[in-house]
Swiss-Prot record:
Predominant place of localization: membrane
Name of encoding gene: ptsG
Catalytic residues (positions): 447, 599
Top-level taxonomy: Bacteria, Bacillati, Bacillota, Bacilli, Bacillales
The keyword Transferase is annotated on this UniProt entry: yes
Gene Ontology cellular component list: plasma membrane
UniProt protein name: PTS system glucose-specific EIICBA component
Residues forming coiled coils: none
Originating species: Staphylococcus haemolyticus (strain JCSC1435)
Matching PANTHER family: CYTOCHROME C-TYPE SYNTHESIS PROTEIN AND PTS TRANSMEMBRANE COMPONENT (PTHR30009), PTS SYSTEM GLUCOSE-SPECIFIC EIICB COMPONENT-RELATED (PTHR30009:SF20)
Length: 675
C-alpha cells in the first residue's frame, strides 16, 4: 500500500515539473522588463528611458506576468500531460474540464461581477468567468482528473454506430461530464478548505515564521532523493500567504506574491520560502565539491575534478543541485542529512537578516542577478558574506567527515579486484549467488542494458558483490533489482534461468562470452569518427533521458534522441553487431571500431517486439543513413513510458567525445564526434 502511494506521489511530483519549467522563461521576461522600467537601473543606464525601449520593457513585463496570472490553467494542462505520458489529448480534456468546472461553480454559487470587487469573499475572474477561486490546487485537481480519464478511456471501444467517438475522442467527453459533477462538491467543500489553508498559513507564517522557514528548507531538502519536494513546496509557493495588489486582487503563495511585488515595484514582503537556497547553491555546495575533489585518491583526481567542477558550476549558475548531491547521497547519508540541516539554517539566517529574495527556477546566480541585484529592492549583498561563511562550513565539515568515516565519495572507492578474478563462464553462477540464490528469485528478466530481478528478500542481495562482478550500477525499486551488466545482461539472464531449472550444472556449460569491450580500440589512421542522427527528430542531453541507467552514464556517454518519424537509420558506416530478440535495441560497430548502442524508447523490452520491424541482420554491413529498424511510433507512444532513444558509445575508453550544438535533426545531420 505504502509503495503504491509512494509511486503515485513520485508521478505527481514529476508531473508538476512541466508547468514549473515554464516559470523561468516567464520570470526572465518579467525581471528584465521590470528592471528596465525601474529607477535603479535607469540611474546607471539613462539611455533605456527611450520610449521605444520602455515600450518593449512594458511588453516584456506583460508577457511574463500573464503566465503568473494564469498559473491554475497552466498547472491543469501540465499535470494532465505529465500524468498521461505526454499525450496532448489529456491537455485538451484538462482545458475542457477547467472551464466547465469554473463556469458551473460560478453559476451554482451565483457569482456576479460585482462580487469580485471584494476579494475577501474568495471569488475571482478566471479566464473571464466569475467563479470560486481555487487557485493552483484547483488546476492540479483538474489535471489529475483529466489524466485519470485519459488513462481509463483512451482505448475504449464503442458500438459501430458510435465508432467516431471511440478511443481518445471519448476522453474529453468523459472529462466534460466528470468536471461538471466535480463542480458541485468543489463549490461546497472548497470554501472550507480555503479557510483552513488561510488559518494554517496565517498561524504558521505569522506566529512561528522562523521555525516555519527552517523546517521548510530542511524537509524540502530531505525529500529531494524521493522526488517528492515538488509536491511539498507547491502549497508554500502558490497558496500559503496572501497579499492584495494595486488592483485589489488577492495574490496567494510566496512565489506569486514575490513576482507580483517585483512587477509593481513595491516594498517586498515575500521570498521567505525561496531565498535560503542562494547561500547553499552558490557557495555551500561548490565548496563541498572542492572537499570531495581534494579527498579523492591521487590517481582519481583528474576524473573527479572534471565531474565536481561541472556539478559545482551547475549548482552555482542554475541552482540545479542533484548532480552534486547524488554523488554523496547514497555513499554518505550523514553528509546529506547535515546538508539538509544547513539548508534549513540558511533559510532561517536570511529571514533573520530581513531579506526578501526569490526566484522562478532555483537559487542560482542567474536568478540572483535577475530577481535580486537588478530590482535592488532588498539588501541582496548580505547573501555574499553569508555564502562565504557557508562555503567554509561546507568545506570543513565535508572534508573532516569524509576522512573521519572514510566515506566512499567519488574517487575514494575501493578497487574491485574481483572483477578480474571472475571468468565469464562462471559469471551467471556468481550473479545468482549475489542475488541471494535460486530461492530468493521471484521473477527473472533482462533487457539489452540490465538484468531485472524481482527478489523475495532484498536483504539477501549483495549489492557490492554485484558491482564487483562487473555491474556498473545497481538500482533498487522495492524488491526489484536492476543490475547493469550492459549487452551481456540477456546472456546472464538466459544462463541463470537454465541454472535454476537444472539444465546447467557447471560453468563450462554457460553461454556468456568473454567481454573484450574494455580492450583498447586501435585507430591507426582514422583520428576521429563522426556520428550522425539515427533518424528524424530532435536531440536532448543524456542527463534528461528518463532512465537512470542512461542519464547517469552507467552504459556510457552519448545523447538522447526523440524520434518524430517511424524509423531508425545507421549513424555511420559499419556492421550490425547485436539485435536484441525483442528488437527494441541494436548494437553497431563503426568501420573505425567505435561501438554504439541505440536503445529505442524506455522500457520497450516489455513490448516483446510489438511495434518494431528489423530491416537488417546481425553481422550485416551497413552504410550511414541506411534504414535499420522500422518502428510504429504511435504504438510506442501509447504503450511505452517514453520514446526517448539513448544513443550510447559503449567503448569510449580514453577517447574524447564532443557534441554538436543541434536540436532538430535528420539522418544527414552530425550529432557528435569521437576522437
Amino acid at each position: 500500500m505504502f509503495k503504491k502511494l509512494f509511486g503515485q506521489l513520485q508521478r505527481i511530483g514529476k508531473a508538476l515539473m512541466l508547468p514549473v519549467a515554464i516559470l523561468p522563461a516567464a520570470g526572465l521576461l518579467l525581471a528584465i522588463g521590470t528592471a528596465f522600467q525601474g529607477e535603479a537601473l535607469q540611474q546607471y543606464l539613462p539611455f533605456i528611458k527611450n520610449g521605444v525601449i520602455q515600450n518593449i520593457a512594458n511588453m516584456m513585463t506583460g508577457a511574463g506576468g500573464i503566465i503568473f496570472d494564469n498559473l491554475p490553467i497552466i498547472f491543469a494542462l501540465g499535470v494532465a500531460i505529465g500524468l498521461a505520458g505526454g499525450d496532448g489529448v489529456a491537455a485538451i480534456a484538462a482545458f475542457v474540464g477547467f472551464i466547465i468546472m469554473n463556469k458551473t461553480m460560478g453559476a451554482f454559487l451565483n457569482v456576479t461581477p460585482a462580487q469580485l470587487e471584494d476579494p475577501s469573499k474568495g471569488f475571482a475572474n478566471v479566464l473571464g468567468i466569475p467563479t470560486l477561486q481555487t487557485g493552483v490546487f484547483g488546476g492540479i485537481i483538474i489535471g489529475a482528473l483529466a489524466a485519470w480519464c485519459y488513462n481509463k478511456f483512451y482505448n475504449i471501444s464503442l458500438p459501430s454506430y458510435l465508432g467516431f467517438f471511440a478511443g481518445k475522442r471519448f476522453v474529453p467527453i468523459m472529462m466534460a461530464t466528470t468536471s461538471f459533477i466535480l463542480a458541485f462538491p468543489m463549490a461546497w467543500i472548497w470554501p472550507f478548505i480555503q479557510n483552513g489553508l488561510n488559518a494554517f498559513s496565517t498561524g504558521l507564517l505569522d506566529s512561528n515564521t522562523g521555525l516555519a522557514v527552517f523546517l521548510f528548507g530542511f524537509i524540502k531538502r530531505l525529500l529531494i532523493p524521493f522526488g517528492l519536494h515538488h509536491i511539498f513546496h507547491a502549497p508554500f509557493w502558490f497558496e500559503f500567504g496572501s497579499w492584495k495588489n494595486a488592483a485589489g486582487e488577492i495574490i496567494r503563495g510566496d512565489q506569486r506574491i514575490f513576482i507580483e511585488q517585483i512587477r509593481e515595484g513595491v516594498h517586498l514582503t515575500s521570498g521567505k520560502f525561496m531565498q535560503g537556497e542562494f547561500p547553499v547553491m552558490m557557495f555551500g555546495l561548490p565548496a563541498a565539491a572542492l572537499a570531495i575533489y581534494q579527498t579523492a585518491k591521487p590517481e582519481n583526481k583528474k576524473v573527479v575534478g572534471g565531474l565536481m567542477l561541472s556539478a559545482a558550476l551547475t549548482s552555482f549558475l542554475t541552482g540545479i543541485t542533484e548532480p552534486l548531491e547524488f554523488s554523496f547521497l547514497f555513499v554518505a547519508p550523514l553528509l546529506f542529512f547535515i546538508h539538509a540541516v544547513l539548508d534549513g539554517l540558511s533559510f532561517l539566517t536570511l529571514y533573520l537578516l530581513n531579506l526578501h529574495l526569490g526566484y522562478t527556477f532555483s537559487g542560482g546566480f542567474i536568478d540572483f542577478v535577475l530577481l535580486g541585484i537588478l530590482p535592488n529592492k532588498t539588501p541582496w549583498w548580505l547573501v555574499i558574506p553569508v555564502g562565504l561563511v557557508y562555503a567554509v562550513i561546507y568545506y570543513v565539515v565535508f572534508r573532516f567527515l569524509i576522512v573521519k568515516f572514510n566515506f566512499k565519495t567519488p574517487g575514494r572507492e575501493d578497487k574491485q579486484a574481483s572483477v578480474a578474478n571472475t571468468s565469464a563462464s562462471k559469471l551467471p553462477f556468481d550473479v545468482l549467488d549475489a542475488m541471494g540464490g535460486k530461492e530468493n528469485i521471484k521473477h527473472l528478466d533482462a533487457c539489452i542494458t540490465r538484468l531485472r530481478v524481482e527478489v523475495n528478500d532484498k536483504s539477501k542481495v549483495d549489492v557490492e558483490g554485484l558491482k564487483a562482478l562487473g555491474a556498473s550500477g545497481v538500482l533498487e525499486v522495492g524488491n526489484n533489482m536492476q543490475a547493469i551488466f550492459g549487452p551481456k545482461s540477456d546472456q546472464i539472464k538466459h544462463d541463470m534461468a537454465r541454472i535454476m531449472n537444472g539444465d546447467i550444472t557447471k560453468p563450462s556449460e554457460t553461454t556468456v562470452t568473454e567481454d573484450t569491450s574494455d580492450e583498447p580500440v586501435q585507430l591507426e589512421e582514422v583520428k576521429e569518427t563522426d556520428i550522425y542522427a539515427p533518424g528524424t527528430g530532435h536531440i536532448i542531453p543524456l542527463s534528461e533521458v528518463p532512465d537512470k541507467v542512461f542519464s547517469e552514464k552507467m552504459m556510457g556517454d552519448g545523447i538522447g534522441f526523440v524520434p518524430e518519424k517511424g524509423g531508425i537509420v545507421a549513424p555511420f558506416d559499419g556492421t550490425v553487431k547485436t539485435i536484441f530478440p525483442t528488437k527494441h535495441a541494436i548494437g553497431l560497430e563503426s568501420d573505425t571500431g567505435i561501438e554504439v548502442l541505440i536503445h529505442i524508447g524506455i522500457d520497450t523490452v516489455k513490448l516483446n517486439g510489438e511495434g518494431f520491424e528489423s530491416l537488417v541482420d546481425v553481422n550485416e554491413p551497413v552504410t550511414q543513413g541506411q534504414p535499420l529498424m522500422k518502428i510504429n511510433l504511435a504504438y510506442l507512444k501509447e504503450h511505452a513510458p517514453s520514446v526517448v532513444t539513448p544513443v550510447i558509445i559503449t567503448n569510449q575508453g580514453d577517447k574524447t567525445l564532443t557534441f554538436d550544438d543541434v536540436d532538430s535533426v535528420d539522418p544527414g545531420k552530425r550529432i557528435m564526434t569521437i576522437k
